Amino acid sequence: MAISKKGIFFTFAAIALALIIILSFKAYKTYEMKEKIDIVGVRIDTMNNFIKDIEQDLEKGLYIASFRAFAGMGEYIASNGTYIADIDEGFNELILEGTLNNKEISLMQNSTFTDWVEKIEAEADKIDIIVNFDILDVNIEQNDPWSVLVSSDIDIVVKDKKNTSSWNRNKNIVTKISIGDFEDPLYIKNSYGRVTNAIVRSPIADFVQGGDISNLLLHLNNSYYIESSTAPNFLMRLQGDLSNSPTGIESLVNLGEFQDQGLPIEDRSAVDYIYFGTQSTTDYGIDGTPDWFKLDSNHLAIYEVQNLTI
């Protein structure tokens, strides 16, 4: 039977329509897939940027909490009249819990590292990201006389609430805390909190110039600090440990300030760890200095007064 021209037309029309439908469907599916890929890509980019921000925020939070923790230790010593028994345990308790020996420290209120981490988690939730932190440890060490290194090992899990991406890693956060301008614990403890001395690095290179002791007196009156391998470092001072350290520092105690506060003074070398300690030394008065000022024989050359003893 011969096929009419009209039948052939409708057959081709049907085939063409089918092809159009198929191609349109494929185009739609391709567009839909591309749209989904674009959305996932945006979420992944958002996650990546957020993760970078997390690492910066963690370092910032560790710095702030650590700074406050060291200042809080000074507050504790002043309030309780005792040194920190265990510097590592005490620091961990302070930076994570805001307490020291279970006593609240005002400087740490809403400022612990734990508080900081929880704030990051709350901010992440606002943009549909789930963040979980597990602080494994916090460590402190002093590798140079003028700063303390604080590090924290943290497991971090970051997930998108729509399950488009996830991220899991361990991160070691490190920050350096300058000890400059912290109060020296030795002064706080031994003056019953009446005399404080901020740790300020001495700007003086030569203490005596041609018999002129003006620089020495400036150094003494301000109780500036110099590096000293026979003295304790900052962390040791917080514990009342007066033994020597390669990262030690020392100052000369201005006993005039102790007298002004009605505190009795001792006839001892004014080098802080000796004056506040118990070791026996041979001491000398120095020409042109206050009557109460003495230096032990081991420090005469350091302060350039070998020829000025009386």
Task: Locate each region found by the language model.
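Long, compositionally biased, intrinsically disordered regions
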Residues: 24-310
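Glycine-centered recognition micro-motifs in short, flexible terminal segments and loops
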Residues: 1-18
